[in-house]
Each structure stands twice: as C-alpha cells, then as structure tokens.
Design a protein with these regions (language model features):
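FMN-binding flavodoxin-like domain, especially the glycine-rich phosphate-binding loop
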Residues: 2-7, 12-39, 45-194, 257-264, ...
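Acidic, Ser/Thr-rich low-complexity intrinsically disordered segments
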Residues: 175-222
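Iron-sulfur cluster-binding cysteine motifs and their immediate structural context
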Residues: 205-207, 212-240, 244-261
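A short, structure-level motif marking secondary-structure boundaries and short turns
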Residues: 85-87, 193, 201-203, 229-230
C-alpha cells in the first residue's frame, strides 16, 4: 500500500519538534504534505483518512507531553489512520510521555505504526548553562530522515491497511541513564524545593534598555502571555515557561534564570541518542 499524503502535526514553541518532524517527512519521500502547526492555536476538527499518514511531534515538559499540546490535539482524529508518534525531550528523560501520546492516538482512532524519542535543546538551556544545546543537530536530523525512509518502507511492504501492523511503544529502547548524575540531580532538586527559594514564574527583561518593543516575543508566545507594546510584562497565569520569547528575542533582552538550568546542565552532560520503534 501507499500513503497518498502525509499530515505533519506539531507543537513547537522553540522549533525543535518542528525540525524533527520536517526531517522525518523528508525521509518518507511523500510530496503531498499538509502541515498543522498547533503552536499558536488548536486544530479545527481535523479528521485524517485511512489512506493518509499522520506524523505527530510534541515536546516533553517535566516528563509529560506538554499539556497545551495535548489540549490542542483534542480535535484531531483518525479513521484507522496510520500514525507515527514522536516526543522531543531536553536530554533529561521523557518518562511516560510516549505512552501518553500513544494512548491519546489510539483513543482518537489512529493506528500507531511507529514511535520515536528525539532530543531537542532544553527550554532552559543558555550559553552559561547549556542543556542539549544545538539539538537536534545534523546527526539527529539525518537519523530522523532515515526513520522516515523506514516508515515508508514499512507502509509499502503492507499489501493492504489491515496488514500494516501497530507497535507497542513500551518496547522502545530507552537510552541509558548513568545512575550517579541522576541521583545527584534528584537530591539537589529535593534540596532546592526544601530551601524555599522562590522560583521565577516567567521569563523577564533583565536590561530594559535592550528591549526595542519590536513585539517579536508577543508574536511567538503560544499563550499570548505577552502583549505587544507592553513587552516588559509577562502574564504569569498564562506563561508555560517554554522560553520561546527568550530564544527568539532578536536583542537577547529576555532571560529565564532558573536554578533548574544549573542542575540540568551539571547532571545531564552526557548526550542521549534518539530511539525509534517500527
């Protein structure tokens, strides 16, 4: 069988999930591509047919699929549609996020034919405290394209939709996590929480002279927590700490200086590899 089109569906405030998804799509060789970007708004009653392929890529926040991504996926449905589910995490751990996305996909009428975990630069990563800086890199994107080719081969090898088998994402290989860095991280997180040190609720403009009020941060914020013309303020009730405004500010005026960045940078130096399941 063949897929007549591919639907790339992603939530990607800092563009890492988007990069991975686009590389997978390129690898499939399918030229009819329909993009659904959930970063700024939810999908509008999207039903994907059985003859198409869906690729869904979302970031991991705190070991779970980003809650806003799940909310905006709510109106996406399949009809026994083959789907590839991908989570992108910041080199710490994706925990149960892939299983969470798998459960959602099955409930929404999709058949999960492949799954993957990729690494993207952590939202809290900075030059001073890098966490998976520059990921996905060239090697990651090559692996993503190779994964796309394998997906196409799997679809082509099935004589009909009923012969295209689903996968059990619980069987995906997990990257090895050295024990002592993880133990050190958990110990320091517990100590930080017990200390009562207040944690920043939102990114902020550290040096107001750098802000030109260009409105870029307001435009890229997925939850409208920043208003153009009032860029020095961020609505803490809306902010999801994705740090799109920090990474996308052309003047480098915005910062998010959290002690978690220090811990992540110190404890997760060893770079993890993407893992795939077909």
């Amino acid at each position: 069988m063949t897929a007549n089109e591919v639907h790339l569906i992603y939530f990607s405030p800092t563009h890492t999930s988007k990069q991975v998804g686009e590389a997978i799509v390129r690898g499939t060789g399918i030229t009819n591509v329909i993009n659904t970007n959930l970063t700024q708004q939810a999908a509008q009653d999207l039903v994907i047919t059985e003859s198409a392929l869906a690729i869904i890529v979302v970031p991991v926040y705190g070991g779970r699929v980003a809650p806003l991504a799940m909310d905006r996926l709510a109106s996406v449905r399949g009809n026994n549609t083959p789907v590839v589910i991908v989570v992108v995490y910041g080199n710490r751990a994706y925990e149960k996020s892939l299983m969470e996305l798998d459960y959602w996909a099955i409930q929404q009428g999709f058949k999960v034919i492949a799954g993957a975990t990729f690494i993207g630069e952590h939202s809290y990563s900075t030059e001073k405290y890098p966490v998976a800086a520059g990921r996905p890199d060239e090697r990651d994107l090559t692996l993503a394209a190779d994964f796309g080719k394998q997906i196409s081969d799997k679809i082509a090898s099935a004589a009909e939709p009923d012969k295209l088998y689903a996968v059990d994402v619980r069987k995906i290989r997990r990257p090895r996590q050295p024990f002592f860095p993880l133990f050190r991280f958990l110990r320091k997180v517990i100590a930080l929480r017990k200390s009562g040190v207040p944690l920043p609720r939102t990114p902020w403009v550290e040096d107001e002279s750098l802000c030109t009020h260009c409105g870029a941060c307001a435009k890229m914020c997925p939850v409208s927590a920043i208003i153009k013309g009032d860029e020095l303020n961020t609505d803490a009730e809306r902010c999801i700490k994705c740090c799109a405004c920090v990474k996308g500010c052309p003047q480098k005026a915005r910062v998010y200086d959290t002690p978690f960045a220090v811990l992540l940078s110190q404890c997760f130096v060893k770079q993890k590899d993407p893992c795939t399941l077909l």
